[in-house]
């Protein structure tokens, strides 16, 4: 086995492990959600359409070219289009996680959200792991406009909320994207737990210090 083949096999196993962990801990249910990562050769490895994140076969993961051509493995999800849009427009993005996790999806269904940043920072981890979290308007799943909107937002952001749909998070590795996704989900949960109670938000100075 070549060095490249060994790296690819390791990444396949990592994707399967992380996906299974999401499923086992209730971040994903049924066949909802999809993950992807960039391979060293520029191709994309992604979870197949209709697959359960808790029961993936490393050898059946979808391999997709940078132009969207399906190369091998099972058929990729139609949502791989917006994964590609993120990779093309943010060179730091090496992996993407999209889930329908409970708390973040619930947050995406609320009216009156600030579309430029749905989460006003109240913990340092929101700032350090995610930064701003812009809202993408609702479109039917698979609609090309999701990819178009994410492409416009990708350069300056790494976490997004699809209205009435769920979260999308990038990372410089699949593990980092997974960690960022979990931080987003736990932050959304805190928003609902806090409810109408007065929240002590971080000041502009505190946010600037975290970003420096």
UniProtKB/Swiss-Prot annotation:
GO-annotated cellular components: cytosol
UniProt feature coiled coil, ranges: none
Matching Pfam families: Aldolase_II
EC class: lyase
Active site: 79 (proton acceptor), 125 (proton donor)
GO molecular function, one term: aldehyde-lyase activity
SUPFAM superfamilies: AraD/HMP-PK domain-like
Protein name: 3-oxo-tetronate 4-phosphate decarboxylase
Phylogenetic placement of the source organism: Bacteria, Pseudomonadati, Pseudomonadota, Gammaproteobacteria, Enterobacterales
């Amino acid at each position: 086995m070549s060095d490249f083949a060994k790296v690819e096999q390791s990444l396949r196993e990592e994707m399967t492990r992380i996906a299974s962990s999401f499923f086992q801990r209730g971040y994903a249910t049924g066949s909802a959600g999809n993950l992807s990562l960039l391979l060293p050769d520029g191709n994309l490895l992604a979870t197949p359409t209709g697959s359960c994140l808790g029961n993936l076969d490393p050898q059946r993961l979808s391999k997709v070219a940078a132009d969207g051509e399906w190369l091998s493995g099972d058929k990729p999800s139609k949502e791989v289009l917006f994964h590609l849009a993120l990779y093309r427009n943010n060179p730091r993005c090496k992996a993407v996680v999209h889930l329908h996790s409970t708390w973040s999806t619930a947050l995406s269904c609320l009216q009156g959200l600030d579309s430029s940043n749905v989460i006003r920072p109240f913990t340092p981890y929101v700032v350090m792991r995610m930064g701003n979290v812009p809202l993408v308007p609702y479109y039917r799943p698979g609609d090309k406009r999701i990819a178009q909107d994410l492409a416009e937002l990708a350069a300056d952001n790494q976490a997004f909320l699809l209205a009435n749909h769920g979260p999308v998070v990038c990372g410089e590795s699949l593990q980092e994207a997974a960690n960022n996704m979990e931080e987003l989900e736990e932050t959304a949960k805190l928003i609902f737990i806090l409810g109408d109670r007065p929240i002590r938000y971080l000041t502009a100075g505190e946010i600037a210090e975290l970003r420096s």
